[in-house]
Amino acid sequence: MCTSIIEVTKAEGMAKRGDEWFPLSHAVVAYDHARHANLGDVITLDFINAVLEPGARAGIELTLETAKELRAALDRAIAAADFEEAEVRGKGAAPVIVRAA
């Protein structure tokens, strides 16, 4: 199945390939059949540097369920980091907690 589900975003950070780290320029998220994992359709994450050689890539293939769990973990970590930045370091507005009536 070729789904043509592809999202590309700029990325700032570092990725490791073998023993070496390289700077990132982009991240690609796709949903398609696995190329390497012995799985069906997968979420593929590719972290790349478009200016370096084609091997400047770190790729991951995840089941859809694992990708959802990773997204939830990222959401929790990002929320905690936002709180840390606002509350502890005084950067940005403090998060607002809305209580149900």
Feature names for model-found ranges:
Residues 1-101:
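Positively charged, low-complexity terminal tracts
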